[in-house]
Amino acid sequence: MTLTSLRAAATCLLLAAGAAASLPAHAGKTLDGIKARGLVVCGVNTALAGFSVADTGGKWSGLDVDICRAVAAAVLGDGEKVKFVPLSTSQRFTALQSGEIDVLSRNTTFSLARDASMGLHQTAVTYYDGQGVLVLKKSGIKSMKQLKGQTVCLQSGTTTEKNLLDYSKTHNLAIKPAVFEKVEAATAAYFAGRCVGYTTDASGLASVRNKEAKDPSEHVVLPELISKEPLGPMVRRGDDEWFAIVKWVVYGLVEAEEYGVTQASVDRLKTSSTDPVVQRLLGTTEDMGKLLGLDRDWLARAVRTTGN
C-alpha cells in the first residue's frame, strides 16, 4: 500500500461519514477493559531509537510510542494514560494473544502468515521499511553480491532469516546466517568480528550503528534492500471495534498531515477552518466519533497530543 492509497482510504471514511452516521458503534471488550482500568496497555520495543526508547527518567518516546499515546488520547482523553510494556521479539505476540497488552506497537512487520494464523489483526502501516545489511567500511564490501559465502549475524524469531536465505538462494550467494535469540547477542557478535555483516530492518541498522558502534562512521549500510517491511500496530482478533479504533486513529493522523492539521494548529482550525474535510475530521460539523464508540473530539485530541 502506498501513502497515496493510505490517504485515500482515510478520506473515503471521512467523506462517507454522513451515510453511516445513524449507526453508532458498540464498545467492544477491549475498550471496556481500558475504560475500567483507565489505561491503554501498549507493548513496545525494549529500546529502538526513533521507535521506542525510555530515557533515564522512564519517559518513553518514538514513533511507536506516539501511536500508543494518540490512541490513549482518542479513547481516554489523555495521551499520558498509557502503560508501556517493553517486549522482546520472542515475547511480543504471546503478550498480545494472552491479553497482557491491548495493542502491540513494536516495529512489527505485517505478513500473511501473521495475519492469518496467529489470531491477530494488522491495523495500519505506520512505517515502510526494508531489510538491509550493515558492514565495516574497511571490509571494502559495497554490494550484497560481495557477501557470497560470508557469515551474517541476525536475530531469530523475525522475518529476517527467511528474507536473507531467500535472497541468498535467488542470487546464488551461499550466505551463512549466524542466528542469535537476542538482538544484543547478534549485534555483539557482529561488532566482535564474528560476522562480516549484521542484518535487520534498515531503521534498526541505523539505530544499531549510531547507538552501539564505537565509531559509527566505520560502518555502512549496503544500498540494497532485500525485502519490503511494512510496520504497524497489531491487535487481537475477535474485537472488531478495537481494531477499527486503532486503525482509524492511524489513518486520521495521516489525513491530518495531508490537510495541514498539526499539533500547533489543531485548536485554531477546529473553530476557524472552512474546509469541509477538516471540519469533519475535527468533529466540528459531524460526530464521526460515535461510529467508533468515541466522542466527536477523538481525533482532535490525538493530534493535539502527538501531532500528525
Specify the residue positions occupied by each region the protein language model found.
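Bacterial N-terminal signal peptides that target proteins for export
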Residues: 1-13
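Extracytoplasmic small-molecule ligand-binding "clamshell" domains
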Residues: 27-30, 35-105, 281, 292-306
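Sec-exported extracytoplasmic/periplasmic mature domains
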Residues: 35-36, 72-77, 97-101, 109, ...
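Bilobed "Venus flytrap"/periplasmic-binding protein-like clamshell domains
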Residues: 41-50, 60-75, 109, 129-185, ...
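Extended ligand-binding regions for polar small-molecule ligands
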Residues: 66-69, 73-75, 138-141, 145, ...
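Acidic, polar ligand-binding/catalytic clefts
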Residues: 69, 73, 77, 81-146, ...
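Short helix-initiation/N-cap motifs at beta->coil->alpha
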Residues: 82-94, 177-192
